[in-house]
Amino acid sequence: MNFENLLIELGTEELPPKALRKLAESFLANFTEELTKADLAFKSAVWYAAPRRLALNITELAIAQADKIVEKRGPAVSSAFDAGGKPTKAAEGWARGNGITVDQAERLVTDKGEWLVYNAKVEGVETKSLVAAMAQRALDKLPIPKPMRWGSSKTQFIRPVHTATMLLGSELIEGELLGIKSARNIRGHRFMGTGFELDHADNYLTLLKEKGKVIADYESRKALIKADAEKAAAKIGGTADIEDALLEEVTSLVEWPVVLTASFEEKFLSVPSEALVYTMKGDQKYFPVFDDAGKLLPNFIFVANIESKDPAQIISGNEKVVRPRLADAEFFFNTDKKHTLESRLPSLETVLFQQQLGTLKDKVTRISALAAFIAEQTGANAVDAARAGLLSKTDLMTNMVMEFTDTQGTMGMHYARLDGETEAVALAMEEQYKPKFSGDTVPTAAVSCAVALADKLDTLVGIFGIGQAPKGAADPFALRRAAIGVLRIIVENKLPLDLVTLIAKAQELHGANLSNANASEEVLEFLMARFRAWYQDKGINVDVILAVLARRPTRPADFDSRINAVSHFRGLEASSALAAANKRVSNILAKVEGELPSSVNVALLSEAAEQALAAKLAELQPQLAPLFANADYQQALTLLASLRESVDQFFEDVMVMADDAALRNNRLALLNNLREQFLHVADISLLQ
């Protein structure tokens, strides 16, 4: 079979930078799915993307589908011929429909009978006649929330489309994409490049770079920007802050990246660096530069989309653009310093947190009390926790945070230090919002943990308490993130906290605000569900999670210890046999009516196997008790794994449901005792 390389390019107006990668990846995934459905073999497939184009390159694509043999079954032989052996009308009609005579048909014999059959050869369709329709279907399935129309056309896409190119090797594939006829013309850089006609699919990247002044390979463009930015920073003795999200956005904004270095007045360094970095990265898409000590330098690196004969002019222009933003930050900072955070408390009364839950002033009052309560249980400074909780939202009323919203908490920390608050209070101002996103770190300082937990629990209990739990994908108060935050803070810091106690205290502090009588139970269930999702994301087997959840441990740190212990136990050789035995025990005990017998009478142990099991349990229990008390569940389950032989022998030799009631109840008590030892950790009968 012959192969050729396929090139598809869509020339557009500027595509949304934050959506560019997803659009290109989805286009590729959709198109390769079409190829697979069409039984078109190919070696590899890659996507290219730049601000004004999406492209695919499929290497060694079959130029046609493979020929197929299609079995066309006809009537049964018994009904295909009459008594004289002549073909019936049914047989002749079937043969005529397939373009053959009855004599040309073959016979198919199965265990159900014999049929006429025709193995028809179906020639494969040429790839060039399939590509346009497949590409259009791939484009139709792109994740575009708000498509637009342009000109007089009714065609819709994320941005207006001007060119479409489909080449199979050197052959132009006829057809249309989004109403644009396929042609060889490729547009270059808007200012630097020239348009050209593409002669062969293999020359796309090279000609586009040489003639069009466009680096279409997204990953190459990204790597070039990163390398050049790092070199530029090193030249001025610094290190560029190149966050991947910002690097992705910048890569999606330029076709021909030119990395340049600019500077700003050193006087602006008196402003907390986070505010300066926020405006450089968030507003201007610049890369800040830091020295070896992590101190911000009065420089930044930016990426131009053009090679200029006078780069100094471009640098000067960017410096002029950023200067007013930095001056604003300086003004806000100097103005905010004139007022303490404490003096801003009354202004929180003017901001509503939630209609039924009161103002931000009401919220910080609750946070303060709950943070102090948590601090007392964890050994943190309760006075600092209460103070940090009270001030926790005051920086929201500052000019700086109102203008640069992402600096909330961080600016609170700086202002708290200027106000003379303790370092624990200042740090808690910043860390209260952690973790902000998946993979973010959690606070580790004791006071910070107390305040972060108090804030999240106050929101969780409050919103559930007024009957506004998240439904479906909607989660306006980010309760799922808050719940994961609560669990992570407690688990990762190994805090001795009980969710039931925390929820009850938060509910108490809300007082009469809450109308949902089941709020505490619903919040606990919500947190438990987050536990399951969190551990699944970490790769823990679902049966392990369910085994622990069955015991309903409400101390997250304890829950985590059980998860780790059961995961370890699951890897032991004895685990599957003991899990099966526990399942058998549970089934037996579930059928017992009334109260289960609890004490074992050694004198009634008549069988050797039950005597051995009872003796083994009696031997282990003194060793297990301190392990359970100290939550050393892994060692406890390792000890319990030694019961395997005794348990197996018991079920092999002993009739549990004996006719003698005394014997039966004694054996049930023994099994109940066995199960209880495992239930100190988890219900291992749920392990698969």
Swiss-Prot record:
GO biological processes: arginyl-tRNA aminoacylation; glycyl-tRNA aminoacylation
One GO cellular component term of this record is: cytosol
Keyword Cytoplasm assigned: yes
Extract the PROSITE patterns matched here: AA_TRNA_LIGASE_II_GLYAB
What is the E.C. number? 6.1.1.14
Check the record and name the SUPFAM superfamilies matching this protein: HD-domain/PDEase-like
Catalytic activity reported: tRNA(Gly) + glycine + ATP = glycyl-tRNA(Gly) + AMP + diphosphate
Q: Where in the cell is it found?
A: Cytoplasm
Concerning InterPro entries, the annotation shows:
DALR_anticod-bd, Gly-tRNA-synth_bsu, Gly-tRNA-synth_heterodimer
- Tagged with keyword Metal-binding: no
Molecular function GO terms recorded: arginine-tRNA ligase activity; ATP binding; glycine-tRNA ligase activity
Q: Which terms are listed as keywords in the entry?
A: Aminoacyl-tRNA synthetase, ATP-binding, Cytoplasm, Ligase, Nucleotide-binding, Protein biosynthesis
Do you know which PANTHER family this protein is assigned to?
GLYCINE--TRNA LIGASE, CHLOROPLASTIC_MITOCHONDRIAL 2 (PTHR30075:SF2), GLYCYL-TRNA SYNTHETASE (PTHR30075)
- Please report which protein family the annotation says this sequence is part of: Belongs to the class-II aminoacyl-tRNA synthetase family.
Share what the entry says about its subunit structure, partners included.
Tetramer of two alpha and two beta subunits.
Can you say what this protein is called? Answer: Glycine--tRNA ligase beta subunit
